[in-house]
Amino acid sequence: MGIKQLYQVISENAPDAIKAGDIKNHFGRKVAIDASMSIYSFLIAVRSEGQQLMSDTGETTSHLMGMFYRTLRMVDNGIKPLYVFDGAPPKLKSGELAKRTARKTEATEAHEEAKETGTAEDVEKFSRRTVRVTREHNAECKKLLKLMGIPYIDAPTEAEAQCAVLARAGKVYAAASEDMDTLCFEAPILLRHLTFSEQRKEPIQEIHLSRALEGLDMDRAKFIDLCILLGCDYLEPIPKVGPNTALKLIRDHGSLEKVVEYIQNDPKKKYVIPEDWPYQDARELFLHPDVRDANDPECDFKWEAPDIEGLVEFLVKDKGFNEDRVRNGAARLQKNLKTAQQSRLEGFFKPVARSDEEKATLKRKHDEKLQEQKKRKKEEAKAKKEAKARPRGAG
């Protein structure tokens, strides 16, 4: 799930933090990828009739199809992927996971009912909600990656947190995940949509944490508190607190402690904090997650030549893939992993820090843009109000 509407908050308040571009812009870069999030996206990329891709024996193969071809696409574009798998979830997350399981059970029942009485759209909608990544999915994807010569590591707990550690240490250029909470774990750069299919034609979003903090005018502590208030995987959200309210509360009060105090002392009782809301524990999980140091031997990784015959045995003979396509893909892997060894020119130069004048200019432009947006929204609201007040039939 990640952080609710964080992308919206950053895009509206720190637009310079987000850069959208083509996959080939990342040629020569090493990227740590949240494997579980990727596998989940492969599994929900179902056919219109709501069915998973299956082998002749009835085994699901959507995850393997996605992992093989999306990884191939990255390597074709000169990217060197490293997959990071989730370990055991933190205890605080168990409540959220239990809710997700309950929702999936409800969705399974609704899916069966929709197949009997509902529309095709209902069937597909509920089918997507029943999807979950299993140990078998993970094990098969690890086997596939090994045969492809693509490295992977296991995180002690959250994969996004481990990706962030590797990115901060410079072992990879960025962390790649659809979960915005990767920024809470202090990933300097987050890439989104990297493992999407080419058909979706979604540009790769590159989000820079330092620019987001600069645009929001926050330090990391305030940013984490904002993210918890927006709604994260560890806690229930506070009802009626949307992105604009969350941002205002943090800006007005400075910390979650002060926000909680304000809400509890508010005579109007506009907001109600859930009974069990251990925000300090959630904050601690973001500030000090259970991760391995980037120099730990278990964080060593390297790209190797693919095992072509092993891939044919696994994907073609065991899973029913097309042999010509698998052999063609393996040949591309072999060729393009060598090409990706070429260094990017930017690796030879250190980025120049922005001067105070440049920062001030950026902030001024950003503030002007915000004022313009607010003015436009007011004008639109006024026009709507006037249109409603106008008698029907009046020109």
From Swiss-Prot:
Q: Could you state what the record's PTM comment says about this protein?
A: Phosphorylated. Phosphorylation upon DNA damage induces relocalization to the nuclear plasma.
What keywords are annotated for this sequence in UniProt? DNA damage, DNA repair, DNA replication, Endonuclease, Exonuclease, Hydrolase, Magnesium, Metal-binding, Mitochondrion, Nuclease, Nucleus, Phosphoprotein
Q: Name one GO cellular component term.
A: nucleolus
* Cofactor note text: Binds 2 magnesium ions per subunit. They probably participate in the reaction catalyzed by the enzyme. May bind an additional third magnesium ion after substrate binding.
Q: Where is this region: I-domain?
A: 122-253
Q: Name one GO biological process term.
A: DNA replication, removal of RNA primer
Membrane-traversing stretches: none
Q: Where is this region: N-domain?
A: 1-104
Which of this chain's residues are annotated to bind Mg(2+) 1? D34, D86, E158, E160
Per the UniProt entry, the signal peptide is none
What the record says about family reads: Belongs to the XPG/RAD2 endonuclease family. FEN1 subfamily.
Tell me what this protein is called: Flap endonuclease 1
From which organism does this entry originate? Aspergillus terreus (strain NIH 2624 / FGSC A1156)
Please name the taxonomic classification of the source.
Eukaryota, Fungi, Dikarya, Ascomycota, Pezizomycotina
Gene name of the record: fen1
